[in-house]
């Protein structure tokens, strides 16, 4: 696993808005990934959680998969033609075929699910603590736990994860 970078390494810079895209106001975004020319979004809220794709020109959302009403959707990751979505407190991850939306698998895991990303081989999951878990995508079994620290102190409440240039970024 790559080194995990604390806030002393955060890039602080100015920015400019290059484009504004419409977005459904009712979508409670929990996971976001741009892949294969489409913006994928995992949303939360009990009874309303979905995985959807968004048309950047119109903001139109196309529901790809709907979670059971009792599940609160969280982070998503696309890997090997599959979409993985965590749930917050249901201890479940869903795996869908990225072309058809068919549910392929359902995995159980301990604790909460918050953020999810991939390096193209493994999955990396946060659970709201200072830990990031390396997961086997075929079994969803934890292979490694990495505790993120900053100046010797644990950095709790890690949420959304992104894999960028060999590093995991978290908010």
Regions found by a protein language model. Give the residues of each.
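Single conserved hydrophobic/aromatic residue that forms the stacking wall/gate
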Residues: 1-11
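A short helix->beta-strand "capping" segment at the edge of beta-propeller domains
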Residues: 12-26, 56-61
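Beta-strand-rich domains and repeat architectures in extracellular enzymes and scaffolds
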Residues: 18-50, 65-77
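Surface loop/turn motifs at the tips and blade-to-blade linkers of beta-strand repeat domains
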Residues: 20-25, 64-69, 105-111, 146-153
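Short coil/turn segments that connect the beta-strands within blades of beta-propeller domains
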Residues: 36-37, 80-81, 120-121, 165-166
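Conserved beta-strand positions in repeat-built beta-propeller and related beta-rich domains
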Residues: 41-46, 83-90, 123-129, 170-171
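Short loop/turn segments that connect beta-strands within beta-propeller blades
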Residues: 54-59, 97-101, 136-140
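Blade-loop segments of beta-propeller domains
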Residues: 59-95, 101-113
């Amino acid at each position: 696993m790559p080194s995990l970078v604390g806030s002393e390494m955060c890039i602080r810079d100015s920015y400019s808005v290059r484009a504004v895209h419409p977005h459904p106001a009712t979508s409670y975004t929990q996971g976001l990934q741009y892949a294969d020319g489409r913006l994928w979004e995992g949303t939360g809220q009990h009874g309303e959680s979905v995985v959807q794709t968004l048309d950047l020109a119109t903001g139109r959302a196309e529901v790809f998969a709907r979670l059971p009403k009792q599940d609160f959707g969280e982070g998503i990751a696309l890997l090997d033609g599959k979409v993985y979505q965590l749930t917050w407190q249901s201890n479940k991850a869903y795996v869908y075929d990225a072309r058809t939306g068919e549910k392929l698998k359902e995995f159980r895991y301990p604790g909460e699910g918050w953020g999810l990303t991939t390096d193209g081989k493994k999955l990396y999951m946060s659970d709201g603590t200072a830990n990031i878990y390396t997961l086997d995508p075929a079994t969803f079994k934890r292979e490694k736990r990495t505790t993120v620290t900053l100046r010797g102190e644990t950095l709790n409440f890690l949420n959304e994860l992104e894999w960028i240039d060999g590093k995991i970024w978290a908010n």
